[in-house]
Amino acid sequence: MRSSRYFLPVLKEAPSDAQIVSHQLMLRAGMIRQEAAGIYAWLPLGLRVLNKIEQIVREEMDRAGAIELLMPTIQLADLWRESGRYDDYGDEMLRITDRHKRELLFGPTAEEVVTDIFRASIKSYKDLPKNLYNIQWKFRDERRPRFGVMRGREFLMKDAYSFDLDADGARKSYNRMFVAYLNLFARMGLKAVPMRADTGPIGGDLSHEFIVLAETGESAVFCHKDLVEMPAPGPDLDWINGDLQPLVNQRTALYAATEEMHDEAAFNALPEGDRLSARGIEVGHIFSFGTKYSEPMKATVQGPDGQQVPVQMGSYGVGVSRLLGAIIEASHDEGGIIWPESVAPFDVGIVNMRQGDAACDAACETAYNALKAAGREVLYDDTDARGGAKFATMDLIGLPWQLIVGPKGIAEGVVEIKHRKTGERHTASLESVLDGLTKSKTT
């Protein structure tokens, strides 16, 4: 992509009402534009990152055996009355009446819809287990939307729902999602700590939040320090028949709790050097809630004994759009965003220091075409802006690599390469730089 043809409305200063770093940088980098309180348009740069995060989530859900579908954003109020949540949900639910006076709502979550789909289709225990997931826009009418995409009213969410015959099967489904979450967050360069959490309006008796530690986190969290650096399990697991409980036990045996579930006495019993109290950002939340929805909505299957039994359910959410904010909060400097390569909007930014100079233009074109041919995503700044402005923009938008082409270097047969994360620069021939950049990505 050439900057001269791209839509990248960067700002020199963040609006005064942007309170946290991620909100400030997303606005300055031309990733989003606020259309109303808590509602944003996703501009091209932001959408590229959003799509990459969504794809990682999709790949890890598929790997863990979940099946994707797409549920409606507008839901029937009657379904929520069946579950008993319509009146309980409160003012966060946006309620709608259509021209026929039917009561509808803009879905804040989808337990009722997916249960309705399940009960119409699955009748026997032989068809279990099932895990259905959906990546869809949700709406919750927050009283005080703030912090940009971190606490907006409209947001993109992945929500998965498991259906099992009994509690043992439900726990296995829960464990699969628990481990899948560890992997998907690690692929985005995040250190997400699973913490025992309150179930809230979703319900159930087992729940974990996945928390990214950040000074701007909305809640206090408490955990054993070893959990922060514990590596992700990786993809090479037996997702169907393997026992994932030891992996879950490894993460849950050590103390970790959100503020609502915090046990100060148990936390203080840890050696002082092992205790970590911090602020955190919730990026995922998983629940096991038994028959909370299946019983009132009559989602039953015929068991091995021929009797009808309500299925055991769980739900598993990831804030896809919120993850952009969390990644920025965890990875930035005074110059701007530092994207992990796995989610960066482009892999490489080419900076032409003297647009219109024949030698510089030719070298940039060679690099641009070679990188694209190798499958790398490239943003080529071919504008007439000053060099300092080009550098500032590249640092702001956080591309992992910057390839800098100037007349002095070209005369000496070299170009400059800068690594955004470390700030390291070195010069080399264009051929050797391109050889390095066309190799496989790392996070």
Curated annotation (Swiss-Prot):
Which GO cellular component terms are attached? cytosol
Q: Which InterPro entries match?
A: aa-tRNA-synt_IIb, aa-tRNA-synth_II, aa-tRNA-synth_II/BPL/LPL, Anticodon-bd, Anticodon-bd_dom_sf, Pro-tRNA-ligase_IIa, Pro-tRNA-synth_IIa_bac-type, Pro-tRNA_synthetase
How is this protein organized at the quaternary level?
Homodimer.
Record family assignment = Belongs to the class-II aminoacyl-tRNA synthetase family. ProS type 2 subfamily.
Q: Per its record, how is this protein called by name?
A: Proline--tRNA ligase
Q: Which GO terms describe its molecular function?
A: ATP binding; proline-tRNA ligase activity
Q: Which GO biological process entries does UniProt record here?
A: prolyl-tRNA aminoacylation
Q: Which Pfam families match?
A: HGTP_anticodon, tRNA-synt_2b
Q: What class of enzyme is it?
A: ligase
Catalytic reaction annotation: tRNA(Pro) + L-proline + ATP = L-prolyl-tRNA(Pro) + AMP + diphosphate
